[in-house]
Every structure is written in structure tokens, then in C-alpha cells.
Amino acid sequence: MNFILSEMTFLRYYMPLIIEAKNRGIRSRVFVGRNNKYNNPRAFVDYIGDLSRVHKFEILDLDEAHKYAGIVFLVEGVEHNKVDNSKTRIVSLTYMTDYSGLYDSYVNKVDHIVLPSKSFAKAYNKNSPKNLYLGSPKYDVELNEEEILRKYDLSGSKKALVIAPRSRDLGNAKLAQIYKTLNSHGLEVLVKTRGKDPLAKSLHGDKYFTDPSWYPHTTMELIHISDIVVNFSSTAIKECVMLRTPLINFHIKPFEKPLKFLYEYDYCENFGKEFSENQLQNAINRLTNQDLGDTFNISIEKHLFTGSSSKRILDYLELY
């Protein structure tokens, strides 16, 4: 099998498929490209090499991709023109909600498009016979709390993960107040941002993270070990639901929140830019003390998926 890696963020989707393929005796090739962003694979060749040695996949230059036949995985149609579609079967994986704007540009250039569920296609009216509702391989990763705590040198105390807003929205986020309130509940404040959206040191909370780990991805690891998440309408809502971590969401984006259907459950408290200290205190109390297992189950069953997506995807491709 072949994988087009033009952004490091794609690894979290590819690695579970590569591992599942290896378990079936199928070798994989990863074609490494480049970009001018913080997630340029060329800046992480040693990291990719380490993964290759552990998981036994071959690394080649993206310019070599057109020489190879078989199944090709890519993300959101990116670099589809680098492969020879006369001898390949192109499978495009969707990336969070990027497909809402990109889908139409590649739907006629690929053979299959893997979406988490029909809810995701319906939400943005992206329907095609090419759609495969098989989940997302990104979540086929075993996360161990003790290993994550050791990896990031964290204590076993209760934790709140703040997924920082984009720089564009930072002026509407009352981060200092939120941190103070979380700390008052005995919660260690972990702050996660993207490499392209750094925060001032005064907003680093108790521990500050960018993207030290591409696979497993840092955000998923931190959600897994946290008791509650503070979100600003990022698509990390999907990770919170899949990992069953309750969240407080502050909608400060200048447009409608993506995947809004996932916010309409009791595992989430929704606020706008303005909120009172009492409201925030009550939200933290409820979410950290209430059993939310049933509401997570309902949301996952209705909108998402269970089980191994990697197995479903490879089963489908082997069958057809």
C-alpha cells in the first residue's frame, strides 16, 4: 500500500492503517513531500525514519509516487496528481472538517472518500457514491495514561486541557480567568496550541504544549489523560467525544461552530464570549462529577463509530 505524506499531521491517519496492513502481511510505502508550514515532513525526517524502523515501511520521495501501482492513500485529495491513476486506486481520507471546503475539488479525482459517518456527509451536503462511511483510522491507537504521564513528565493530579484558540480569536478568549477558575478546582491546567499559533508566556498555564508528538498525536494524548477540556469551537470536539472527555466550549469564532451537532449533548457546556464566574464554576462542578457515559454512548452511536476503522477500511479494499 502507498501513502502520500505531504504534511506531518497526516501521520495520525496513516499509521494505524500501516500497522493494520503490516499485521496482514502487507508492506507499505510512504512517499514524503514537503510544504512551507510548521508540519513540513522534510523537517522531521529522523522522526519518520524512527517510525519506519519500528513499523517496517519504506520511505521514498514524493516524486517517485507515479512509478508505483496499487492502493494509494492520501488526505483531502492532496497531491492526487502525483500518482498515476491508470494503475492505482486512490482512497482519500477526510481531515476533521477540511472536506467541507475541499471535497468538491477532488471528488472526481479519486476512487473512494472515507468519512467518519453519514452525519458528517449530511452536515455539509457532501454526498457521492464514492463515499465510504467507515470511521476514521486516526482513533485506532492505544493510549495508556501512565505512559503518557511519563512521556510528558506529568503528575497524577486532576487535569484540565485548554485547547487554545487561533491567534485570530485570542482577543475574545478570557484565558487568564479560565485558568484561575480551573486551578481553584484543584485542576492542573495543560495548554495545547498549534505551532503556528504560539501563546505569550503569561498564557502558558501550568504546562504548555505545541506538537511534540505527531503519532500518537499530542492533543489526543492530552485529552485522554484530562478530566475536562476547554475548547473554543475547534474540531477537537470529535476527539473529546471519541475519548469520552467532557468539555466546556466557548464559541468565539466569527462563524458557526464546525460539527455543531456534537455540541448538543450533556457532556458539553456551551458559552459565548461573555460568561459569569458562577456559570463557569457550576459547569466545572457538573462535568467533573456527573456520570456522562450514557450521553457519550448516544452521541457516538448516532454520529460517529466504534471499533477499528483501519480494519473496516482494509477489509473493504480487499473485498472490492
Indicate residue ranges for each PLM-predicted region.
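Donor nucleotide-activated moiety binding/catalytic core segment of transferases
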Residues: 59-65, 195-243, 247, 254
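Active-site and donor-binding regions of nucleotide-sugar-utilizing enzymes
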Residues: 2-145, 169-171, 197
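Catalytic binding pocket for nucleotide-activated donors in carbohydrate/polymer assembly enzymes
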Residues: 107, 126-127, 133, 235-303
